[in-house]
């Protein structure tokens, strides 16, 4: 059974968030958390928060299972474009440049590993 978490209206451009999403796609949850904690990207903080929420949602949906981070993996991560706020920046000769402040929606889906590796 899978669980998902959605973070909406994040004030980061979707392009920057997709770079972070690509780092953790398909990884084990404990490995993904380590990657996000050590990442220098600002968007990784929001991605880590959403990943922790997805793991908590999995535990909430499956109360009779005790599942650790090493038994879960990031099944899919996708970033959708959110609302774009249009602002004006004063420019020379009485003109104005348009500034687009972009946002995104981050969705993380976690699932249990089918055949856990024994170490």
UniProtKB/Swiss-Prot annotation:
GO molecular function, one term: structural constituent of ribosome
Keyword Ribosomal protein: yes
Example of a GO cellular component annotation carried by this entry: cytosolic large ribosomal subunit
Biological process per Gene Ontology, one example term: translation
Alphabetical list of SUPFAM superfamilies matching this protein: Ribosomal protein L22
Pfam families attached to this UniProt entry: Ribosomal_L22 (PF00237)
InterPro entries in UniProt: Ribosomal_uL22, Ribosomal_uL22_bac/chlpt-type, Ribosomal_uL22_bac/org-type, Ribosomal_uL22_sf
Keywords assigned by UniProt, alphabetized: Ribonucleoprotein, Ribosomal protein, RNA-binding, rRNA-binding
PANTHER family attached to this UniProt entry: CHLOROPLAST 50S RIBOSOMAL PROTEIN L22-RELATED, LARGE RIBOSOMAL SUBUNIT PROTEIN UL22M
Record family assignment: Belongs to the universal ribosomal protein uL22 family.
Subunit: Part of the 50S ribosomal subunit.
Task of the protein: This protein binds specifically to 23S rRNA; its binding is stimulated by other ribosomal proteins, e.g. L4, L17, and L20. It is important during the early stages of 50S assembly. It makes multiple contacts with different domains of the 23S rRNA in the assembled 50S subunit and ribosome. The globular domain of the protein is located near the polypeptide exit tunnel on the outside of the subunit, while an extended beta-hairpin is found that lines the wall of the exit tunnel in the center of the 70S ribosome.
Name of the molecule in the record: Large ribosomal subunit protein uL22
